[in-house]
């Protein structure tokens, strides 16, 4: 979808995202070079990173508060390399975010370490998480 036809969301270069968010991914991803192919998606007044799949990263997501904004973001990411099967998961609850997802389906095993591996986080980042929050690896 052309950006000028989608006023509710726009794609920007990855450096348009906030530095703390970029640093978050840079510190945790097993393959930080994925950030070179990421997009900053500007929605609802802020720019959030959409990190593509690749290597051990099997999927990604972007939370949005409005369905129409999620539909716009989905349209912008669809068909781009590293963003397969872009879809919108609607929240049934009015006080929760809707989620634009891409890649494989998240394995809901109630296991934050498995989920971290799914999102391509490094073993070092997962070990740090486990130590901090007491989860087993």
Where are these predicted regions, by residue range?
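Conserved short secondary-structure elements within globular domains
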Residues: 111
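Activity-critical C-terminal alpha-helical subdomain
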Residues: 119-120
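A conserved ligand/cofactor-binding region detector
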Residues: 1-106, 114, 123-137
């Amino acid at each position: 979808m052309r950006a000028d036809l989608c006023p509710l969301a726009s794609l920007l270069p990855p450096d348009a995202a906030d530095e703390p968010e970029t640093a978050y991914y840079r510190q945790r991803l097993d393959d930080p070079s994925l950030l070179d192919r990421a997009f900053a998606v500007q929605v609802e007044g802020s720019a959030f990173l959409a990190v593509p799949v690749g290597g051990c990263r099997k999927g990604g997501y972007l939370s949005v508060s409005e369905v129409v904004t999620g539909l716009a973001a989905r349209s912008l990411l669809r068909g781009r390399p590293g963003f397969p099967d872009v879809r919108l998961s609607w929240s049934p609850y009015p006080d929760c975010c809707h989620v634009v997802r891409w890649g494989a389906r998240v394995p809901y095993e109630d296991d934050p370490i498995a989920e971290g591996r799914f999102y391509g986080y490094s073993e070092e980042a997962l070990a740090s998480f486990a130590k901090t929050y007491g989860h087993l690896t």
